[in-house]
C-alpha cells in the first residue's frame, strides 16, 4: 500500500533530481518507490475493473472479469488451432 508519506518522498526525489541530481542510493530508492507505487496502482485498478458488472437491456448482469476470461480463453484456443 502506498501511503501519503511515500508519495511525498517520490515527489521530493523527483524535484531534487531536477534541481541538483540524485546520489546512487537516492536513485535506487526512487526506482524502488516508483515500482511499489506502480504495483499498488495496478492492483487497485485491477480490483476495481474486476468488480464492474454490465447491465444488459434485458436486465441481466454480466461480470466483466468472467467475460474477459472467456474471451482470452477463446483467443488462446484460436491461436492454438492456427499453430497446428
Curated annotation (Swiss-Prot):
Keywords: Cytoplasm. Belongs to the UPF0291 family. SUPFAM superfamilies: YnzC-like (SSF158221). InterPro entries: DUF896 (IPR009242). Pfam families: DUF896. HAMAP family: UPF0291. The keyword Cytoplasm applies. Gene3D superfamilies: Helix hairpin bin. This is UPF0291 protein EUBELI_00985. It comes from Lachnospira eligens (strain ATCC 27750 / DSM 3376 / VPI C15-48 / C15-B4) (Eubacterium eligens). It is found in: Cytoplasm. GO terms for cellular component: cytoplasm.
Amino acid at each position: 500500500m502506498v501511503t501519503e508519506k511515500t508519495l511525498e518522498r517520490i515527489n521530493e526525489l523527483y524535484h531534487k533530481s531536477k534541481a541538483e541530481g540524485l546520489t546512487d542510493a537516492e536513485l535506487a530508492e526512487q526506482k524502488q518507490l516508483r515500482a511499489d507505487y506502480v504495483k499498488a496502482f495496478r492492483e487497485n485498478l485491477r480490483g476495481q475493473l474486476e468488480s464492474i458488472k454490465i447491465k444488459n437491456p434485458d436486465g441481466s448482469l454480466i461480470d466483466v472479469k468472467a467475460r474477459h476470461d472467456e474471451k482470452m480463453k477463446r483467443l488462446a484456443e484460436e491461436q492454438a488451432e492456427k499453430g497446428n
